[in-house]
Amino acid sequence: MQQLEVISILKKDLNFNERSIEKLKKFVELVLNENKNHNLIAKSTESSIWHRHILDSAQLVKFIDFKLASLADLGSGAGFPGLVIEIFNKNKDFHVKLFEKSPVKKQFLSKVIKELDLGAEVYGDVRNEVLDADIIVCRAFKKLERVIQVSREIAK
């Protein structure tokens, strides 16, 4: 599935607006550029980034109640799914919290947030943070048992 097909799905089925699509395009550009120097995503998935990473992350917006206060993305890595959700987010009172222990990835996440003028916040290793969240998401973070354990510790 190519970029244009994914964008069509994002607009029609998931209600992404044109502003969000433009931010996603810039986000993809930033990920691919940074991936030349640091392993943010597997090189083998670069050509399928729109389907494998963007659409896979974006499908979560159907299940998120943006009237709640916050969402935590555990092991955010390159920002999937947290930054995709933040790009979609239209509620200024809804906060996306990105948890990432890698200093390189934390720096990248902060750069994306600044360049795209997003409201997400970056935190360090989830084990060292005392934060709460209404919704917890993750993608390729840990084994399910560990995800549940960490979720219990930070969920409201």
Each language-model region and where it sits:
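Conserved beta-strand elements of the Class I
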Residues: 72-74, 135
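Class I SAM-dependent methyltransferase "Motif I" SAM/SAH-binding loop
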Residues: 75-79
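S-adenosylmethionine
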Residues: 82-84, 91-156
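Short, charge-rich binding segments
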Residues: 63-65, 87-91
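Class I SAM-dependent transferase core
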Residues: 2-68, 72, 104-118
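Acidic, metal-associated active-site segment
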Residues: 57, 80-83
